[in-house]
Amino acid sequence: MKVVKAAAVQISPVLYSREATVEKVVKKIHELGQLGVQFATFPETVVPYYPYFSAVQTGIELLSGTEHLRLLDQAVTVPSPATDAIGEAARKAGMVVSIGVNERDGGTLYNTQLLFDADGTLIQRRRKITPTHFERMIWGQGDGSGLRAVDSKVGRIGQLACFEHNNPLARYALIADGEQIHSAMYPGSAFGEGFAQRMEINIRQHALESGAFVVNATAWLDADQQAQIIKDTGCGIGPISGGCFTTIVAPDGMLMAEPLRSGEGEVIVDLDFTLIDRRKMLMDSAGHYNRPELLSLMIDRTATAHVHERAAHPVSGAEQGPEDLRTPAA
């Protein structure tokens, strides 16, 4: 049975620099490749960084200030030199890489998850379908085209970001599509220990229901970085310690390694796919333990288009001259 060496990566972005953060990610992919890692998950929108500032700034402050503008400037276009660099690093390491970026498409930002196969090919670009609370001031909404599991060199991979793990239908879409490895991403630092505890519930429950491995990555900010990007604007809210929970969960919902709760590093675990079969013999949520004739999910995986073109058809008589359109005399 197949065994895949997987890594959940806890890493700090280089604030306000897309290029420096990408360089750091590329270096980490190389290091993991030297350790024989075949699959790696990086944190939510780690390139260039998660918009932590939006948790404490009002809409007016975001519009008149510089934080949102800087993020727009440093965001990632897909494809671009930034994505090319990550793909090339994945190719050189022979590694499947799942990573979160702030994607810029025109004048709109999206919380986007990218998946690169071991040959460096970008095989999935999905956007968070519903940004959470204050995130809606920053990101647009994604569509259903990315709510699917994708075949890769290491198996079928599904991706969700942060509070999407509280959407049971989104999770079931991936379960029913046969994901074997679930790549979960959260922002981590600055949201408190309660955030980490709820995250643990989310990812362990998803592993239990899906019968898949969950490789979960959170980002780390040190105290100086938190003070730099999260400024108390008078609402009495500032940085909160805690919020990281980088780990890997087995298909039966049990933790396979002690989670990283602070600092940079990675959790590396060998994923024995026999464990998937053992779990699904007991409970296959999209198979023998389901009743699709009673309960089923409808999903629209159509990619959203802002313009829909229709072919022009001549109106009856439009090709006739004025003389031809006269009403015949009685």
From Swiss-Prot:
Its EC number(s): 3.5.5.1
Q: What is this protein called?
A: Nitrilase 3
Kindly state which keywords UniProt assigns to this record, in alphabetical order.
Hydrolase
Q: What is the originating organism of this protein?
A: Unknown prokaryotic organism
Q: What PANTHER family does UniProt report for this protein, alphabetically?
A: CN HYDROLASE DOMAIN-CONTAINING PROTEIN (PTHR46044:SF1), NITRILASE (PTHR46044)
Report the GO molecular function annotations: nitrilase activity
The UniProt catalytic activity note for this protein reads: a nitrile + 2 H2O = a carboxylate + NH4(+)
Note down the stretches annotated as region Disordered: 310-330
Residues in CN hydrolase domain copies: 4-273
Which InterPro entries does UniProt cross-reference here? C-N_Hydrolase, C-N_Hydrolase_sf, Nitrilases_CHs
User: What is the stated purpose of this protein?
Assistant: Nitrilases catalyze the mild hydrolytic conversion of organonitriles directly to the corresponding carboxylic acids.
Catalytic EC class:
hydrolase
Its family remark reads: Belongs to the carbon-nitrogen hydrolase superfamily. Nitrilase family.
Active-site residue list: E44 (proton acceptor), K128 (proton donor), C162 (nucleophile)
